[in-house]
Amino acid sequence: ISHNSIYDTPRAGINISEGTWGGHIIEYNDIFNTVKETGDHGTINSWGRDRFWHPNYNIMTQITNEKPALILADVVEPIIIRHNRLRCDRGWDIDLDDGSSNYQIYNNLCLNGGIKLREGFYRTVENNIIVNNTLHPHLWFKNSGDVFSRNIVMTKYKPISVRGWGRDVDYNIFADSLAYLAARQLGGDAHSIVTTVKFMDAAKGNFNVADDSEVVTKGGFRNFPMNNFGVLSSRLKRLAASPVMPV
């Protein structure tokens, strides 16, 4: 699913229902003004109610402990979410819900709603820009295998009933010292940094940072293109709207 401009939607702009063998790639989309008629949803939303999933969390924990092969039985190949510009004002920019597993999420510009990962396994979230928001980990398993690394984060993590912090939550770049200290108190982010984050021209949609900034030199963040989101043709570009840039 590539180079679409999707906006003014009652629910998600793109929704993935169950793993369906994985291997899906969602890239270079411009998705905003979503979730206009409900809540508890995301601009890119997913459900992972695969064969290991159970509505009772304790039973699901038992199933995955006893039969770990079930975790990737339905999402064999990773699902990739990359190079998208996303904004949700009534939910999350990315919402991986209900067991969503085996995801690679990188180089996304999240303009408002942050990234939520509910219970699931093997989600790698790296090198994303999370403007005015943060990571929302909900009900993580002790052995989730999740990775959250080298992301620009602006507010405190918002965990709910987290039983473990995945394989690696570290090497992130915090724009707020209190958010950084709160993350350290949770036991992770030992190698993360707190620094001033100065975007090139946020008002015009350029959220890259200077190559000599600490975000890059110490944090390891890698800039990615800011001009490839959405439709490609000149005709469609003239028709397509653009999201409001955050302040």
Residue spans for each PLM region:
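Glycine-rich beta-solenoid repeat tracts in large extracellular/virion proteins
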Residues: A12-G19, T38-R49, K67-D74, W92-G99, ...
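Acidic, glycine- and Ser/Thr-rich low-complexity intrinsically disordered tracts
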Residues: G42-T43, W47-Y57, S144-V247
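Right-handed parallel beta-helix
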Residues: I1-A12, W21-K36, D50-I63, V75-C88, ...
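Carbohydrate-interacting regions of secretory-pathway proteins
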Residues: I63-E66, L70, G220
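Generic anion/oxyanion-binding catalytic loop in active/binding sites
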Residues: N33, L70, K204
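Surface-exposed beta-strand edges and their flanking turn/coil or helix-capping segments
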Residues: I16, G39-H41, Y57-I59, I94-L96, ...
